[in-house]
Regions:
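Residue patterns forming the tRNA-binding/recognition surfaces of aminoacyl-tRNA synthetases
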Residues: 1-8, 21, 63-67, 94-258, ...
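Short active-site loop/helix that positions an aromatic residue
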Residues: 2-18, 24, 40-45, 114-123, ...
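Short acidic-glycine loop/turn motifs at beta-strand connectors
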Residues: 17, 25-29, 130-131, 247-253, ...
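Conserved oxyanion/phosphate-binding beta-strand-loop segments in alpha/beta enzyme cores
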Residues: 48-94, 182-204, 292-320
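Alpha-helical recognition segments enriched in aromatics with Gly/Pro capping
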Residues: 121-133, 237-239, 263-400
Length: 400
């Protein structure tokens, strides 16, 4: 792994079922390594004295239990490991045998592919990480540490357990915040989603009726629509349109309240009266009595994805009569990046609201981006933007 902190949330180890793996005798130990990587890996580990004992298919490792070396340090993980389907080896075709040992550890709390495998196999997600991205008490020895700050200590602990074969530095891609350039940490969080596969082919059928003027942006947009990737509509922020969902603190019953009147009619307590401010923190003070168990219901403290707001523009800003007369609009235009932004949310929400293959626009022109001298997108945060006013002082307007 290139992220030692993910050993705290380790759940499975993956082998490629179609590839060969070798059992290798190294001193008093037996190692398992992908056959393709054996010679190169042993050179990297500076191991010359070893012997191949046998060769097996990756599929043979499906369902075997293994012992995590740091269980004594991580109380929550030690409890999880007692589950039948936890800390087992699995055989999955996504495993890349051309890097490392040809074997990968899976941390469902810190990676999308790992998470999807866990969901498919009904493996519980262990995520002892709080809102400040620090380990909680369930992380045992590492509690209170920012997860990336725990990397070095975890490596030292693995070494002390005589479980470290090799450590080194490699150059690889890593996700960064597009504004601050800080390293990002992937976390499995409880959120709200639109499960777009439930729309069937309505969205793609609607998108195919639109004129895009050029094939490249058209093909890019249609490919994204065809993915039917779940859309996370909730955000863990303070500013924004509050998610209008109340959840029971006891039985977890859910109420969806889409108007001020519905909230007032069901409210158990209105601290600011019936004309309360609809945003946070005021709306968070309102409690509702659960219809099922009479316990207290509290609003889910999420706001909506701001793209949800912009995607709802035709419905939110027009009366029913105005909508019928003006939608679908004859023409929209935006930057090419809006294939995953406004163009996407406008179309998806229009299909959802109508429950039909109806686009909110008849044509959409995706414009290209002006790039800097290195071919990178211009960005104010990066500081590589050219001021059009300065250019117009030097060059003809039609050229600019």
């Amino acid at each position: 792994t290139t992220m030692p902190f993910t050993l705290v949330t380790d759940a499975m180890v993956g082998f490629n079922p179609d590839e060969e793996y070798v059992y290798v005798s190294v001193g008093s130990e037996t190692w398992i390594i992908g056959k393709i990587r054996l010679e190169e890996f042993m050179k990297e580990a500076k191991m010359e004295d070893y012997k191949v004992l046998k060769t097996v298919k990756g599929s043979e490792f499906e369902g075997k239990k293994y012992t995590h070396p740091l269980l004594g340090n991580i109380s929550g993980l030690e409890k999880m490991s007692k589950q039948e389907n936890y800390h087992i080896t699995i055989a999955e075709k996504f495993v890349d045998v051309n890097a490392g040992t040809g074997i990968v550890h899976l941390s469902p709390a810190n990676g999308e592919d790992d998470y999807n495998i866990a969901m498919k196999r009904k493996v519980e997600i262990f995520s002892p990480i709080d809102d400040e991205v620090k380990f909680t008490e369930d992380a045992g020895k590492y509690a209170g540490m920012f997860v990336r700050d725990a990397d070095e200590e975890i490596v030292r602990d693995v070494k002390e357990k005589n479980a470290l074969v090799r450590i080194g530095k490699i150059k690889h891609k890593y996700p960064l915040c597009w504004r601050s350039q800080h390293k990002l940490v992937w976390l499995a969080r409880r959120e709200y989603f639109y499960m777009l596969d439930r729309l069937g082919d309505k969205a793609i059928n609607a998108a195919q009726k639109v004129e895009y003027f050029f094939d490249q942006p058209k093909n890019r947009f249609l490919k994204i629509i065809k993915e039917k990737h779940p859309w996370c509509i909730s955000r863990e922020r303070f500013w924004g349109c509050p998610l209008p969902i109340w959840k029971c603190t006891e039985c977890e019953n859910i109420e969806r309240l889409f108007s001020r009147k519905e909230i007032v009619d069901m409210a158990d307590d209105l601290p600011d009266g019936p004309n309360f401010e609809l945003h946070r923190p005021w709306i968070d003070k309102i409690s509702i009595k659960c219809k099922k168990c009479n316990a207290k219901m509290q609003r889910e403290e999420f706001v909506l994805d701001t793209w949800h707001n912009s995607g709802a523009a035709p419905f939110a800003s027009l009366s029913d009569d105005e909508y019928e007369k003006t939608i679908p609009a004859p023409f929209f235009t935006e930057g090419i990046d809006q294939t995953r932004g406004w163009a996407y949310t406008l179309l998806i929400e229009n299909v959802i609201f109508n429950n039909k293959a109806i686009s909110p626009y008849n044509s959409f022109l995706f414009q290209g981006h002006v790039l800097d001298e290195k071919g990178n997108k211009m960005s104010k945060s990066t500081g590589n933007v050219l001021d059009a006013a300065d250019l117009l002082d030097k060059y003809p307007v039609d050229l600019v």
